[in-house]
A protein has these predicted regions:
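Glycine-centered tight turns that cap/initiate beta-strands
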Residues: 11, 35-36
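Basic/polar phosphate-binding segments, predominantly the helix-turn-helix DNA-binding elements
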Residues: 28-30, 36-75, 93-118
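An amphipathic alpha-helical interaction segment
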Residues: 1-13, 17-27
Length: 123
């Protein structure tokens, strides 16, 4: 019986450690999403290897780090489009980490079913 409890405790502490590592990476994304972020940088932000980073994202969040980053950037872009204040779509795309406005348009349309221009016209 003691071995079962010990294994459960070990599993729980490993899961908590993994969650803490993911949280560190998510904070890094939130603070740096407007820059060019690599998988290696995400992993380094939590002192883990890129392969461990991939595994943790799949296990804990059910997605890849790059897909998470893309979704996060698109959500931030949507927020910024709501309060554009005269800024162009290209400027908003750049501020959210998209170096190519046409790539931003394609990603936005794929995620939300309309282009950033169509979205802005609808709000």
């Amino acid at each position: 019986m003691g071995a079962i409890i010990e294994n459960e405790t070990s599993y729980t502490s490993a899961f908590q450690r993994d969650e803490l590592r993911i949280k560190k990476i998510l904070v890094y994304v939130e603070n740096n999403y407007g820059t060019n972020i690599t998988l290696e940088e995400l992993a380094n932000s939590s002192n883990i290897s890129p392969s461990t980073c991939l595994r943790l994202f799949n296990t804990v969040l059910g997605t890849t780090p790059i897909k998470y980053l893309l979704t996060f950037r698109l959500q931030k872009a949507m927020e910024e489009l709501k309060r554009a204040n005269g800024r162009t779509i290209s400027e908003i795309a750049q501020s959210c980490g998209f170096s190519d406005a046409s790539y931003f348009n394609r990603c936005f349309r794929k995620e939300y079913g309309k282009t950033p221009s169509e979205y802005m016209a609808s709000i």
